[in-house]
């Protein structure tokens, strides 16, 4: 089983000289979002851990066994500060024992003096529509649910109004993500789209009002 924590996240943090984390926030407990978090927690200290209000998945249970971080369950409308950066919890649905973890996905807006990013996990269209009237624009949007047609509704995209939309998705996946309808909606709202299945790992920086995106893929063929 490929562990993104030990194979990707930890080496990159060490490359950057990061030896501890002030905060780790997980959108929800599915393996493709929380997998690898336990390996990170086992190797570097974490001060605060923010989790969705859902039944803990196996990945989150493993994480909790490997950290002494202050445990915080996210609540809608709560803000946290990291220096000059604000972490805004826009939506934090409370999941039930029999609900899909996607329905508990956090929608989070990260804002600094340089720019803003909206993270959506696997948020559903229903959750997006409930937050469309509350969320402020974000220059960058992490597109929900790998670009599924069942997310990224036009009211939500209009509210966020992203310059750049990032789709984290595996090449040749069996779900057909990203969906053609989602790509059409992103084009209609004027967002530049970058995809990990085409571009590999992406690094995003802010330069004044401009958003810059760098690809770390060196081969033309799919991974």
Regions found by a protein language model. Give the residues of each.
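Non-globular, low-confidence helical/coil segments that flank catalytic cores
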Residues: 1-223
């Amino acid at each position: 089983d490929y562990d993104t924590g030990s194979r990707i996240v930890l080496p990159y943090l060490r490359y950057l000289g990061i030896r501890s984390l002030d905060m780790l926030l997980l959108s929800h407990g599915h393996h493709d979002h929380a997998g690898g978090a336990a390996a990170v927690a086992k190797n570097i200290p974490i001060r605060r851990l923010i989790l969705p209000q859902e039944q803990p998945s196996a990945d989150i249970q493993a994480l909790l066994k490997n950290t002494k971080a202050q445990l915080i369950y996210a609540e809608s409308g709560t803000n946290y500060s990291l220096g000059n950066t604000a972490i805004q919890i826009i939506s934090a649905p409370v999941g039930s024992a029999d609900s899909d973890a996607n329905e508990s996905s956090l929608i989070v807006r990260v804002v600094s003096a340089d720019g803003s990013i909206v993270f959506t996990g696997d948020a559903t269209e229903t959750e997006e529509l409930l937050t469309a009237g509350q969320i402020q624009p974000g220059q960058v949007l992490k597109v929900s649910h790998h670009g599924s047609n069942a997310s990224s509704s036009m009211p939500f995209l209009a509210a966020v109004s992203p310059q750049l939309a990032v789709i984290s998705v595996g090449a040749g996946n069996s779900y057909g993500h990203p969906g053609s309808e989602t790509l059409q909606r992103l084009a209609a709202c004027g967002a530049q789209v970058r995809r990990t299945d085409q571009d590999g790992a992406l690094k995003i920086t802010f330069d004044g009002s401009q958003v810059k995106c760098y690809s770390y893929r060196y081969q033309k063929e799919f991974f």
